[in-house]
């Protein structure tokens, strides 16, 4: 009876150690995919960050890195 109990405990430990990496691995993979999809290239971000460089089409000044919008982002007013 003791051998059966020990065998069951060993089996339970082995199964639990196998289940942990598999369950966490799926979530980590999904998180990595979401992170990579959200990343922007330097060209998408603009030269100065998350704004549009000059000569990009705009509707509001906040879209432009220079905060100057006249249908297109401008370097100065």
From Swiss-Prot:
Record's subcellular location: Secreted
Disulfide bridge positions per record: 51-65, 58-69, 64-73
Entry GO terms, CC: extracellular region
Entry protein name: Conotoxin PnMEKL-04
Expression (tissue specificity): Expressed by the venom duct.
Propeptide residues per the UniProt entry: 20-45
Keyword terms of this UniProt record: Disulfide bond, Knottin, Neurotoxin, Secreted, Signal, Toxin
Stretch forming the signal peptide: 1-19
A single MF term (Gene Ontology): ion channel inhibitor activity
Chief place of localization: secreted
Family in the record: Belongs to the conotoxin O2 superfamily.
Annotated domain remarks: The presence of a 'disulfide through disulfide knot' structurally defines this protein as a knottin. The cysteine framework is VI/VII (C-C-CC-C-C).
Matches recorded under InterPro entries: Conotoxin
């Amino acid at each position: 009876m003791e051998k059966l109990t020990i065998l069951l405990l060993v089996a339970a430990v082995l199964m639990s150690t196998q289940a942990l990496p598999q369950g966490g691995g799926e979530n980590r993979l999904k998180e990595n995919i979401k992170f990579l999809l959200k990343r922007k290239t330097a060209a998408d971000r603009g030269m100065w960050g998350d704004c549009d460089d000059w000569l990009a089409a705009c509707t509001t000044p906040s879209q432009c890195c220079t905060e100057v919008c006249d249908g297109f982002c401008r370097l100065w007013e």
